[in-house]
Amino acid sequence: MTNSLPLDEIICQLQESWQNLPDQRKANNNKQYEVSDAALSAYSVFFMQSSSFLAHQRDIHKRKGKENVSTLFGVKKIPGDNQIRNLLDPIKPDHFHADFKWVHKKLAENGCLATFLDYQNTYLVALDGVNFHSSEKIHCDNCSHRQDRAGTTHYYHNAIIPVLVKPDSQHVISLCPEFIVPQDGHEKQDCERAAVKRWLLQHHGDYQPHQVTFLGDDLYANNPLCKLIEESYEQFFVFVCKPTSHTTLYEQLASSTKIETRQERYWNGRYGEIWSYRFVNKLPLRSGDDALLVNWLELT
């Protein structure tokens, strides 16, 4: 059994899968570029050591007589940056979800996915928002926006990028992203928490029969979201919980007589450390009768 998944095998799968991507252009005989070639060209950017897609291809062609994208990714005719955007922007991200699941299926078959199980036989999924576009001028209908104190409007694109992680490893496995974009029928702007809820709705059962422990910062330590994870989807979470945003919890903590402590010695590879733990169970995440009771842990 091997834990590798060759790039050639992935590219072959993507070539086949992306032949079925929707083409928003009107039917005619003068189409210069295929949507699948645009998708493969965009995918190839992740493997380049150049800030310019076309400049890199021209340099390779000049030195070796054949473009890198054609050789490695099987692109028949290489579109430029603008053509790639025009062809791919109208395509909904959902069309690419099956490709993520194909990769995960292959990683499960070759044993790689099993190496990410923790000591409780659950997967660890880190949740985080990523900003991948910001401008005061360039914007589209899918942009979020905010105004600063000077009244300047800032436009930006964010997405939730969940990844499968494991302790003491620098490697992660990317999961399907969820983009933070205006939602039909909603007047308020989209946000990270709403995007995470949509992601959970679609993907919470992807790794059954194994359960998932979700990891995240203070933003996710929110009563409705935590209840959704624990009660509706029967999964686990470990979220940062700051005193400034969880005053009720820390007031209860300050008056608690049930705080337990523990110390352990740990060798970090260079010198010894003493890890000090403080923990207590069943503290309310917020005020109110419907507050979720959570376990609190501090490590210093």
What are these regions (language model features)?
Residues 85-169:
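Active-site-proximal, Lys/Arg-enriched surface segment
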Residues 39-44, 163, 198, 224:
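Contiguous, well-ordered alpha-helical segments that form the cores/surfaces of helical PPI scaffolds
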Residues 131, 164-166, 177-181, 218, ...:
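Short, structured patches in soluble enzyme cores that scaffold and shape functional sites
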Residues 1-79:
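Gly/serine-rich nucleotide phosphate-binding loop at the start of the catalytic core
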Residues 147-211:
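Electropositive, glycine- and tryptophan-enriched low-complexity nucleic-acid-binding patches
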Residues 41, 56, 80, 84, ...:
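Short, conserved catalytic/metal-binding motifs centered on acidic residues
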